[in-house]
Each structure stands twice: as structure tokens, then as C-alpha cells.
């Protein structure tokens, strides 16, 4: 079965300013995949993964480029993919119980969005579904990363739709935020 991979992760500018930039970044990716049913059918397969930092995306500094293939999720050309890059501080905030909370909340948001968008033109529906998942991820990040004593990781920019329409596709996403800038290259293999 084909999978979606990160082919390359490049640190253009690590997060932080001043003294905060003296330490390297450890980054990880959140990915949501949801299959888009046709007609009035709402049955859908979803997947939520948390990948990294591991040895492949830790201690990243300005100009670092990591080219190890890192598997993220199953590939389905009829699915929507939304990804978010996170900078880890201390322990990873999206782990254990938090991962289950993300998965459950995203699945609820996805099912509701599928129901709301039945009958819409495909491009309009995909946009609405991607926006729903992006908003849900941002809300979850606020809870699990922004509440004192709950977490301290930092989202690098907003969640983004990853478009890989064919097995020969590659896509580059630009993640900018928290004064950091990363470029991720994704592929199907």
C-alpha cells in the first residue's frame, strides 16, 4: 500500500529570537487524513498521526536540511490531508491522552463537516472540510499547548492542506510562525 512521506524537511529559520535562538529546534508533524465519500454517504475512514521529532527532525538549526524519508499516513487519492508543524519544548505536548483527544475531536469535526457539505461542488466541499479540520487543530493546540502547566509546544504557522493528487505527486509546504520558517517536501511512495 502506498504511503505519504516527508521527503525533506528544511529549516530556513529556526524559531525564537535573541537568546531563544541559541538552542536548536526539535519539530514534529500532526497529520489528519479523511476519506471523502460521494453522494449522501457519510461513511469515512480517518487517520490522525503524530510524527517526530525522533532523530530525523531534532536539533535543527538555520539552513539544516533533513532528507530521510519519514512515513506519515496511508495514501488515498480520494482523501483530504491537513498537516501542521509543531516546535517541541521539553516533552511533546501531543502524546498519550492528548493524542486520543485530538483524534476524537477531529473525527467529530470531520463527520459534522461531511454532513454540512453534502451536495456541495467538490472544490467547495474540499475547501470547507480543510477549513474545519484546520480550525479544530488550532483550537486543540490552544488547549494542549497554550494552557499553563498543560503544554508549551509552539505551532509553526497554521495547519495546511496537503494536496497529492497522484502517486507521482510531490508538494512543498511552507510553515511560517513563532518567528520560524520551515519547508516540508512531501511525496507518495
Q: Over which residues does each language-model region extend?
A:
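Peripheral membrane interaction modules
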Residues: 152-159, 163-189
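Solvent-exposed serine/threonine-rich low-complexity stretches and specific carbohydrate-binding patches
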Residues: 39-62, 159
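C2/C2-like lipid-binding beta-sandwich modules
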Residues: 1-28
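Short beta-strand-plus-loop segments that form exposed binding edges in beta-rich domains
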Residues: 11-17, 85-90, 176
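Eukaryotic beta-sheet cores, primarily in C2 and C2-like/PH beta-sandwich modules
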Residues: 29, 60-120, 141-148
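Membrane-interacting helical modules
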Residues: 116-138
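A composition-biased, non-transmembrane "mature-region" signal
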Residues: 2, 14-17, 32, 36, ...
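Extended low-complexity, serine/threonine- and proline-enriched intrinsically disordered segments
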Residues: 25-37, 85
Amino acid at each position: 500500500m502506498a504511503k505519504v512521506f516527508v521527503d525533506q524537511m528544511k529549516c530556513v529559520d529556526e524559531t525564537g529570537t535573541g537568546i531563544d535562538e541559541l538552542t536548536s529546534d526539535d519539530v514534529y508533524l500532526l497529520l489528519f487524513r479523511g476519506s471523502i465519500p460521494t453522494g449522501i454517504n457519510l461513511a469515512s475512514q480517518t487517520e490522525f498521526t503524530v510524527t517526530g521529532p525522533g532523530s530525523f527532525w531534532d536539533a535543527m538549526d538555520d539552513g539544516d536540511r533533513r532528507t530521510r524519508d519519514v512515513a506519515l499516513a496511508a495514501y488515498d487519492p480520494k482523501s483530504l490531508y491537513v498537516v501542521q508543524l509543531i516546535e517541541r519544548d521539553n516533552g511533546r505536548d501531543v502524546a498519550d491522552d492528548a493524542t486520543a483527544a485530538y483524534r476524537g475531536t477531529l473525527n467529530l469535526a470531520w463527520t459534522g463537516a461531511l454532513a454540512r457539505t453534502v451536495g456541495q461542488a467538490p472544490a467547495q466541499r474540499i475547501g470547507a472540510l480543510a477549513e474545519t479540520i484546520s480550525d479544530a487543530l488550532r483550537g486543540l493546540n490552544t488547549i494542549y499547548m497554550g494552557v499553563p502547566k498543560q503544554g508549551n509546544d509552539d505551532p509553526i504557522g497554521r495547519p495546511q492542506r496537503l494536496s497529492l493528487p497522484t502517486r507521482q505527486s510531490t508538494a512543498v509546504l511552507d510553515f511560517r510562525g513563532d518567528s520560524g520558517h520551515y519547508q516540508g517536501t512531501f511525496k507518495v511512495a
